[in-house]
From Swiss-Prot:
Induction: Expression is probably sigma F-dependent. It is found in: Spore core. This is Uncharacterized spore protein YtfJ. GO terms for biological process: sporulation resulting in formation of a cellular spore. The keyword Transmembrane helix does not apply. Residues 60-74 have a biased composition (Basic and acidic residues). The lineage of its organism: Bacteria, Bacillati, Bacillota, Bacilli, Bacillales. Pfam families: Spore_YtfJ (PF09579). It comes from Bacillus subtilis (strain 168). Keywords: Sporulation.
């Protein structure tokens, strides 16, 4: 069976989209600054693709007179396809001698990252509270023992 005309449309559109896509689309090419830091752009990438077509009514299949085999007749076809790409920079990844930093362009949307950044400090505070609580309990037990000895 021959390829359907819409396959050609889809193949062409997908090949063109594929040419636009590479790893540098999301993580940009590194830029080195004079102080030795390296800056990478982090982008949000969105792709869209659509294809459609229609076959119009044609003549019914005809029989050959010599060997009575039916031959397939191609119906008239109309179709189209399209695609689009949206690339939006969302952050810069800065790698320098002081460490790695993520500089977001929209600070309001990164609540989870802020929570993760605060997690070590929060855990440390919780540990300190437990240590104080254990220390207070042990002091309270010692005080109770002392009170029991005095009676």
């Amino acid at each position: 069976m021959a390829d359907h005309p819409i396959q050609g449309l889809m193949k062409t559109a997908m090949e063109n989209l594929k040419e636009m896509i590479d790893v540098n689309t999301i993580i940009g090419d590194p830029v080195e600054t004079p102080d030795g830091s390296v800056i990478l752009t982090v982008s949000k990438v969105g792709f869209g693709f659509a294809a459609g077509g229609s076959e119009f009514g044609g003549k019914p299949a005809e029989k050959k007179s010599e060997d009575d085999e039916t031959r397939e007749q191609k119906l008239p076809f109309g179709g189209g396809s399209g695609g689009g790409v949206s690339i939006t920079p969302i952050a810069f990844l800065i790698v320098g001698s002081t460490g790695i930093r993520m500089l977001h362009l929209d600070e309001n949307t990164h609540l989870i990252e802020k929570i993760l950044d605060a997690a070590p400090q929060t855990l440390e505070r919780i540990q300190q509270m437990f240590k104080k609580n254990n220390k207070n309990q042990s002091q309270g037990q010692n005080q109770n023992q002392m009170n029991n000895m005095n009676y």
